[in-house]
UniProtKB/Swiss-Prot annotation:
Coiled coil: none annotated. Belongs to the LDH/MDH superfamily. MDH type 3 family. Substrate binds at residues 83, 89, 121, 152. SUPFAM superfamilies: LDH C-terminal domain-like, NAD(P)-binding Rossmann-fold domains. PANTHER family: L-2-HYDROXYCARBOXYLATE DEHYDROGENASE (NAD(P)(+)), L-LACTATE DEHYDROGENASE. InterPro entries: L-lactate/malate_DH, Lactate/malate_DH_C, Lactate/malate_DH_N, Lactate_DH/Glyco_Ohase_4_C, Malate_DH_type3, NAD(P)-bd_dom_sf. Catalyzes the reversible oxidation of malate to oxaloacetate. One of its GO terms (biological process) is lactate metabolic process. Keywords: NAD, Oxidoreductase, Tricarboxylic acid cycle. This is Malate dehydrogenase.
């Protein structure tokens, strides 16, 4: 049986980490693509040389030509400019939209059957544009945001309660930006709702509110600390979890940026929602009940994403 083929568009910090994780998990052979000559080749060789130590079998190929991604089963897109201190994800719009146009053309030509995961910011607008540029069906093109934002939320909660991250369930809806919606009401520790933990004296509502805000600011916190780039370990791990669920037909329930067709009152836009990811891509979109405040927050987040999509159309009218 032939190995799966995983193509990584962009060989920066996230791309290199993706390649390493794909190797460690033996998800398939990896192609690293980048416009910078030598970078994907060097990283691919370096990771390949770690395989005898870590005991995994996979082929790593570096390339500067889209032809190398031909026939890929999964394509993960990280290409574009990362955030720097003081920048919002939205500041990257004009630059990264042009990148998505080139990437979309490459995927359309060489990997039209692939499951595509976009990580490039501003995430929700970029995955929306990438789907249009590539022409791939919407259920095969998703954005990585909710898994990462939820992981941050889960980690902060585990620290607050001094429990294993494995026992914390939490997820985040909406756009991947300052208006994201961490849902405390649907978050639990070993099945115990956060509201009950407040009553039990494990934490306070004020502390939970601060954790929710820290989750929203999670990416900016790391950008501020690194000063020269943005997060890459957690984003890469999140995308690999999505790719693994697709490749192994695990049918994981994961929050991803998916195209909505009426769910949550939204049409033809990519927004973070809980989904089932299996061998057919997005196999189901889970529409949960939101209370009045949650719905207002979600609608605000959707409006923010809609504004970014309109800005994209202003730059590239063909997206309309």
């Amino acid at each position: 049986m032939a190995r799966n083929k995983i193509a990584l568009i962009g060989s920066g910090m996230i791309g290199g980490t993706l390649a390493h994780l794909a190797g460690l998990k033996e998800l398939g052979d990896v192609v690293l693509f980048d416009i910078a000559e030598g970078t994907p080749q060097g990283k691919g060789l370096d990771i390949a040389e770690s395989s005898p130590v870590d005991g995994f079998d996979a082929k790593f190929t570096g390339a500067n030509d889209y032809a190398a991604i031909e026939g890929a089963d999964v394509v993960i897109v990280t290409a574009g400019v990362p955030r720097k201190p003081g920048m919002s994800r939205d500041d990257l719009l004009g630059i990264n939209l042009k990148v998505m146009e080139q990437v979309g053309a490459g995927i359309k030509k060489y990997a039209p059957e692939a499951f595509v995961i976009c990580i490039t910011n501003p995430l929700d607008a970029m995955v929306w544009a990438l789907q249009k540029f590539s022409g791939l069906p919407a259920h095969k093109v998703v954005g990585m945001a909710g898994v990462l934002d939820s992981a941050r939320f889960r980690y902060f909660l585990s620290e607050e309660f001094n429990v294993s991250v494995e026992d914390v369930t939490a997820f985040v809806l909406g756009g991947h930006g300052d208006s994201m919606v961490p849902l405390a009401r649907y978050s639990t520790v070993a099945g115990i709702p956060l509201s009950d933990l407040v009553k039990m004296g494990w934490t306070s509502q004020d502390k939970l509110d601060k954790i929710i805000q820290r989750t929203r600011d999670g990416g900016a916190e790391i950008v501020g600390l690194l000063k020269t780039g943005s997060a890459f370990y957690a984003p890469a791990a999140s995308a690999i979890q999505m790719a693994e669920s697709y490749l192994k037909d695990k049918k994981r329930v994961l929050p991803v940026a998916a195209q909505l067709s009426g769910q949550y009152g939204v049409k033809d836009m990519y927004v973070g929602v809980p989904t089932v990811i299996g061998a057919n891509g997005v196999e189901r979109i889970i529409e949960i009940d939101l209370d009045k405040d949650e719905k207002a927050q979600f609608d605000k987040s959707v409006a923010s994403v809609a504004g970014l999509c309109e800005a994209c159309i202003g730059i590239a009218p063909s997206l309309k």
